[in-house]
Amino acid sequence: MSDQIIDAAQARSVQANAAKAQVLFGWIIQHDPPEHPGKYVARFATAHPTIYIMLADTLAELQAMLPPGLARSPRQPVDPPEIVEIWFSKQARRRIW
């Protein structure tokens, strides 16, 4: 399965489809993963990571590309070292925490 690089408009569409289906979703932000060295990567995830990713040179640039309606969850000690943060829907965050 290879990554499909999407832009901010496509990310809004992917996220809207997940919201309509009422599934838990989020964007996993990584820095410098082996398949995209030196880049920040936002990977869309539902029950599992998907093929949809956005790429940027900086964290701020990538955060600006994320669709609206998200809440940031900081990196947890159990996360792999390349994970920087995870963004969940605000509704999901209220249910989880």
Model segments located where?
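Short N-terminal "domain-start" leader segments
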Residues: 2-39, 71-75, 81, 93-97
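Generic structural motif
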Residues: 32-34, 47, 59, 91
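A short, structured beta-strand/loop element
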Residues: 36-51
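Short, Lys/Arg-enriched charge-dense amphipathic segments
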Residues: 50-51, 57, 94-97
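Cysteine-rich, disulfide-bonded extracellular modules and peptides in secreted proteins
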Residues: 51, 65-67, 81-88
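A short, charged, amphipathic alpha-helix used as a generic interaction element across diverse proteins
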Residues: 52-76
